[in-house]
Amino acid sequence: MSDKKLYVVAVELENRKEQAISVQEVLTKYGDCILTRQGVHDPGSDRGIITLNVNADNVYLEEFSEELSRIPGVKVRTIKF
């Protein structure tokens, strides 16, 4: 069994209106590892950022991040603690 670690995952959406449904589907799929979620949008633009606190092993986090990154216009950055 792999050890779970705490991560902060930042998800940037270039056009949140177009990408929200696809991103939400991935977040729901991996919801068992998401501890907290905060979303903010850039006033005056369609950009948005979602910040997640995640408790997962490295393999699961990689799968999660890669699936989000495959959505056109979505960027993912991760910090491990």
Residue ranges and their predicted role:
Residues 1-81:
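Long, contiguous binding/interaction regions
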